[in-house]
Amino acid sequence: MPATELADCFQEPEGSSAESGDVAFGSGLHQVPGGDEFRAKSVMSWHYYFPLFLYDTEKYVWWQRDLAHNVFGPTVFGGADKELKKIGGGQFLTEFGICLPGSSRPDYWGTQECEWVMQRADQHGLSWCYWDTSDLGVLWNSEGNAVNTAVDILSRPYPMSVPGTQLRYSFDKNTKIFKLEFQSIEDISTPGKIYLPSNIYGENRYFKHSEDLEVRLSDEDSQLLDITVKKDSVTTTNSWLVVGVTSELPSIRSNNWLDTFLSFIPFLSR
């Protein structure tokens, strides 16, 4: 353990108290292992499960869905953000599951729960991992083949890397429109990578972007878009990209914070 012993990470700093709520909730850490110099190299791993699942039901009970998606879920995701503001580092939703997604059952509670978690993860800029085992057989059947009805739900577009910071992105499963916005950094020469799953886009990959970007299909993988910031580009707004399955694509109006907020309203999960 460099610089700081692990036990030191759990010690309460002077002046802290139980009134802050840090004692009862959160990770219990007051700094990342290794101390402040390791903030940029640390990632908090956490899991998400709604505790009141009713496994024998087909559809959500209305109060259960409201509790999960309007109270419990937002509190957990927001709590993880607050924890990161306190101790620093990044975060990774390394496990969620129990919900069994299926494109042939859109009203099934498992499908709706998985879609909600992924949409919420997008809002918070989170990578995620769905938990499956050989006994569950959610993603792979007994013959080792992919379960396509699950793939249809769990496979989504996402930014693998971006030449900038402060990224925001969203995906609308109905229109199949993916939106990305970020503050570009011209000095980054390596192209960013956007993953566009073939089960959603196939050969119908249309995109529109801000003038400061160069966007092209990747030579290494037909499911990837390469994003590069143009040299000597001048922009007073955020860089943006929109991808869809038709040529009729909206723009992200990045002239001010209000326009940016309004452009994302249709894709916010309430």
Which residues make up each language-model segment?
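Extracellular glycoside hydrolase catalytic/binding regions
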Residues: 1-118, 122
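C-terminal catalytic-base region of ester-bond hydrolases, centering on the histidine
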Residues: 44, 61-66, 87, 99-100, ...
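Generic short alpha-helical hydrophobic face used as a protein-protein interaction/packing hotspot
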Residues: 48, 132, 209-211
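Short, low-complexity, polar/charged sequence segments that are solvent-exposed and flexible
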Residues: 62-67, 147-150, 200-201
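Short Gly/Pro-enriched loop/turn and capping motifs at secondary-structure junctions
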Residues: 97-101, 135, 187, 200-201
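Extended, alpha-helix-rich binding/interface surfaces that flank or overlap catalytic cores
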Residues: 110-195, 204
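C-terminal beta-sandwich/jelly-roll accessory domains of carbohydrate-active enzymes
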Residues: 169-270
